[in-house]
């Protein structure tokens, strides 16, 4: 069977060099994405089932106990460079009583959406290609079935409409920022800044490609009025690109994209930032202030809403749960 897979993948790559061959494999079999000529199976990408399970288990958990599961978020980078991984939120996770991605989040209806927004910013800034199943971008509450279309009418509710626009802007930003994808499979493309905040459920890391550098700060607890001090190597200022809790996304933070100057220290630029509960932030790192040219933050045109069906709509989104 291994020889069959190797010969099949070699042949497909020769006949269709633009085709992507992706393996769904939950084992630790070595070399799934290694070229056949180097002893591998020759797939282009492999689903990171470990990342998916650890991440969703973490977000299902009560925030009070997330400190004990803190390293469910950090563990994926311990093995990440062994394969060319793809991060999957597939249809398998929205069927057979498993609930949709938004529904998996801990808490009541209003609590689920800020966590889902933070989750997706984490996903999009984690190394690896992304797989998202249709309906995830709507914050859909009903499990998928092949017998009916997506619940487009749910976009009539402000929290879902804001979530849809958030996912649109996140996708646009992902396409615009090379640091989020160009060096996915190079070790120098990712660096932990802080992964020892178990009691506060805070994570900070850097993504880079060539001279482009981005800082990501995640806060996965429900603690209010938090201040976080972080030191970033070779950083003179931070430019906010996206905040999962901006008011335009149904959050609590007014949008502000002004440069944030850091205080020089021996280890780098230091800054103290306020953290909203269940939030994630993405910044561009500027090594100098005078010579840097700030690219404008994402101001994508408003996405067209998908065509809605003519069927009867629900009175409230929450009744769909």
Regions found by a protein language model. Give the residues of each.
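Conserved alpha/beta catalytic core and glycan-binding cleft of carbohydrate-active enzymes
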Residues: 1-147, 175-178, 185-230, 234-237, ...
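Active-site rim elements
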Residues: 102-113, 151-161, 267-272
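A structural detector for beta-sheet-dominated domains
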Residues: 155, 231-233, 276
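Catalytic cores of secreted or luminal carbohydrate-active enzymes
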Residues: 158-180
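A residue-level signal for conserved active-site and pocket-lining positions in enzyme catalytic cores
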Residues: 170, 238, 278
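Non-heme Fe(II)/2-oxoglutarate
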Residues: 246
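C-terminal beta-strand-rich structural cap/linker in extracellular carbohydrate-active enzymes
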Residues: 255-295
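Intrinsically disordered, polybasic Lys/Arg-rich low-complexity tracts
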Residues: 291-321
